[in-house]
A protein has these predicted regions:
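Sec-dependent bacterial lipoprotein signal peptides
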Residues: 1-15
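Export/targeting segments at the very N-terminus of extracytoplasmic proteins
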Residues: 26-62
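Short, functionally critical alpha-helical segments immediately adjacent to catalytic or ligand/cofactor-binding
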Residues: 52-67, 109, 128-132
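A short, structured beta-strand-centered segment in the mid-to-C-terminal lobe
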Residues: 95-104
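Catalytic and binding regions of secreted/periplasmic enzymes and modules that target cell-wall glycans
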Residues: 110-149
Length: 158
C-alpha cells in the first residue's frame, strides 16, 4: 500500500509546475484622481516612445496638473504645464491652445522630459527638478545638447 501511495505522490509531483515556471505577477495600479483609462494609455505610450519610465511621466503629470488636460497656469499649458516655446523647441508647430489636448501635450512635454531624464543620469528626483527648472545649461555642460534636442535644431519624427 505504501508503494502505491508513493507512486501516486510522485506522479502528482511530476504533473505540477516546477520552480522554473514562474507566473508573471499582474499589478493593477489604481487610477490616480482625475486619471482615465484613455489618459493612462496615452501616458504609457508617450513614456515608451521616449524611453522614460512611466512612473516619471505620472509623477510630473500629478505634480503639474493632477491629470487635468485643460489645466492652465499663466503661460503654461496642459497635463505637463509646458510653455509653448519649450514645446516648439521639441517640434511643436501648433497654436498654444493645442497643448490643452492630452495627446499633443504628452507628445512634446515627454520629449522635453526625456532630456531632463538624460541630464539627471536616470535619477527620478533630479529629472523632475530639471524638468521644472529647465536644463539647457546643464545639458550644454554635460555635452548633451544634441541628444536632448533642447536647442531646437533636432528634427523630430511626426
Amino acid at each position: 500500500m505504501r508503494y502505491v501511495v508513493l507512486i501516486l505522490c510522485m506522479g502528482l509531483a511530476a504533473c505540477s509546475g516546477g520552480p522554473g515556471e514562474a507566473v508573471p505577477e499582474v499589478v493593477d495600479v489604481p487610477f490616480y484622481p482625475n486619471e482615465t483609462r484613455e489618459l493612462r494609455a496615452l501616458i504609457e505610450a508617450a513614456a515608451l516612445e521616449n524611453d522614460v519610465p512611466v512612473a516619471l511621466v505620472q509623477r510630473v503629470v500629478i505634480r503639474e496638473s493632477t491629470h487635468r488636460p485643460g489645466a492652465r497656469n499663466g503661460p503654461y499649458y496642459g497635463l505637463m504645464q509646458i510653455l509653448p516655446a519649450t514645446a516648439r523647441s521639441m517640434g511643436f508647430r501648433g497654436q498654444p491652445s493645442d497643448l490643452l489636448d492630452a495627446e499633443t501635450n504628452l507628445k512634446y512635454a515627454v520629449r522635453y522630459l526625456r532630456g531632463a531624464w538624460l541630464v539627471s543620469q536616470s535619477d527620478m528626483d533630479a529629472a523632475v527638478m530639471w524638468y521644472a527648472r529647465g536644463y539647457y545649461f546643464e545639458a550644454k555642460r554635460l555635452g548633451l545638447i544634441e541628444e536632448t534636442g533642447v536647442d531646437g535644431r533636432k528634427v523630430w519624427p511626426d
